[in-house]
C-alpha cells in the first residue's frame, strides 16, 4: 500500500538564516515522516505581472510593507557602514544553505506561477501549513501561506501556525475568515493566535506545542552529533538574540563576569546591532543547524 502524499507549506527556503525556523521545519518533517506519510515541501515561485502588483500593493503597504522597506534599507546601509557585516552574513548563509540542501531540498517540489501551484495541490491527499509566523499580515496576499491555492476537495489544516502580531489589519478580516473556514482543523502555537482565529472566523483553534518540542532530547542530541564543529571545552554561556535590546545583552555580560564563563554569541542575527560587538569571546558565523543545536546542548547557560 502506497503512502499518503502530504504537502507541507513550511518555512524552509534557502537564503534565510533563522535557526529557529530551520529547526521547526526539520522537526515537522521528521514527525510527518515518522507517522508514515510521504511529505513534500510545496514551493511557490511567484510570476507576477504589473497588473498583479498593482492589485496587491495597497494591501501590502497596509500590512507591513513600509516596515519591510525600512528593514531592507537599513540592511543595505549597514552593509556599507560596517566592513565585515556583509561578508559574515554570507558565511552564515552558506552554512545554513548547505544544511537545507542536504536535509530539505530533496523533498522540494517547485511550482512556477499561481496556476501551476493550484493544479499541483490536487496531487496531494492533504496539505498543511506551519509552523512559525506563517500568517503574518504581509504574507496574506500571496495566497500561499493561507492555503487559498489548495483545491476545495483536498483537506487542509494548520499546525502551530502563528500570526506574529497582536492584531490583523481590518482590510484582511473577511479574507482571514474565508481561508480559516476552508480548513478541516486549525492549530496555533500561542493564545493570541487562538484569539484571532476565533474572533474572525467560526473555527475553533487548538494551541499546540512548537514542533521542536515533539522530538525527544535523545533525538536532538543525535541530530547534533552530525556537527563537525568543535565547541569550547570549558563551560560557556551561549547567546542567541533576536532584536536589538541592550538590557539582555548587558545581563549576559554580568552573568559572564559573575561566573567567569566565556560567552559564545551569534551576532547580528536579524539586523546589525552595535551592542553585539561589545560582548562575546567567540562569535562564529559558519554555523549550520547541527552546529547550532550542539552549541545549545553543550552550554552551561543559554
Question: Where are these predicted regions, by residue range?
Answer:
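Charged active-site motifs of nucleotide-sugar-dependent glycosyltransferases
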Residues: 5, 232-236, 261-262
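Aromatic- and Gly/Pro-rich donor/ligand-binding loops
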Residues: 6-178, 225, 249
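An anion/phosphate-binding loop that grips the pyrophosphate of nucleotide cofactors and donors
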Residues: 124, 183, 299
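Catalytic donor nucleotide-activated moiety binding site of glycosyltransferases and closely related
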Residues: 158-165, 197, 241, 248-285
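A conserved, positively charged/aromatic
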Residues: 177-182, 296
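A short beta-strand/loop micro-motif in the catalytic core of glycosyltransferases
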Residues: 183-190
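Donor nucleotide-activated moiety binding/catalytic core segment of transferases
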Residues: 205-213, 217, 273-302
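Conserved donor-binding/catalytic core segment of Leloir-type glycosyltransferases
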Residues: 229-243
Amino acid at each position: 500500500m502506497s503512502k499518503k502524499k502530504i504537502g507541507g507549506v513550511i518555512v524552509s527556503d534557502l537564503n534565510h538564516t533563522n535557526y529557529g525556523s530551520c529547526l521547526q521545519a526539520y522537526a515537522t518533517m521528521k514527525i510527518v515522516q515518522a507517522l508514515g506519510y510521504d511529505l513534500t515541501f510545496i514551493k511557490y515561485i511567484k510570476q507576477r505581472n504589473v497588473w498583479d502588483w498593482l492589485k496587491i500593493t495597497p494591501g501590502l503597504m497596509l500590512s507591513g510593507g513600509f516596515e519591510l522597506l525600512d528593514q531592507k534599507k537599513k540592511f543595505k546601509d549597514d552593509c556599507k557602514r560596517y566592513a565585515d557585516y556583509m561578508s559574515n552574513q554570507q558565511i552564515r548563509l552558506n552554512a545554513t544553505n548547505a544544511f537545507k540542501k542536504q536535509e530539505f531540498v530533496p523533498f522540494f517540489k517547485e511550482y512556477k506561477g499561481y496556476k501551476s501551484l493550484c493544479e499541483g495541490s490536487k496531487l496531494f491527499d492533504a496539505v498543511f501549513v506551519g509552523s512559525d509566523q506563517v500568517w503574518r499580515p504581509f504574507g496574506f496576499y500571496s495566497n500561499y501561506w493561507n492555503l487559498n491555492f489548495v483545491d476545495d476537495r483536498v483537506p487542509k489544516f494548520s499546525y502551530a501556525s502563528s500570526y506574529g502580531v497582536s492584531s490583523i489589519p481590518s482590510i484582511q478580516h473577511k479574507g482571514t475568515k474565508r481561508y480559516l473556514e476552508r480548513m478541516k482543523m486549525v492549530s496555533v502555537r500561542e493564545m493570541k493566535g487562538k484569539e484571532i482565529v476565533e474572533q474572525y472566523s467560526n473555527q475553533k483553534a487548538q494551541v499546540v506545542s512548537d514542533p521542536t518540542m515533539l522530538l525527544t532530547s535523545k533525538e536532538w542530541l543525535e541530530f547534533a552529533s552530525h556537527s563537525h564543529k568543535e565547541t569550547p571545552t570549558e563551560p560557556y554561556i551561549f547567546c542567541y538574540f533576536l532584536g536589538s535590546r541592550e538590557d539582555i545583552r548587558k545581563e549576559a555580560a554580568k552573568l559572564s563576569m559573575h561566573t567567569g564563563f566565556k560567552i559564545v554569541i551569534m551576532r547580528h542575527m536579524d539586523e546589525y546591532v552595535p551592542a553585539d560587538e561589545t560582548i562575546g569571546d567567540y562569535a562564529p558565523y559558519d554555523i549550520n543547524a547541527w552546529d547550532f543545536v550542539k552549541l545549545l546542548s553543550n552550554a552551561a547557560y543559554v
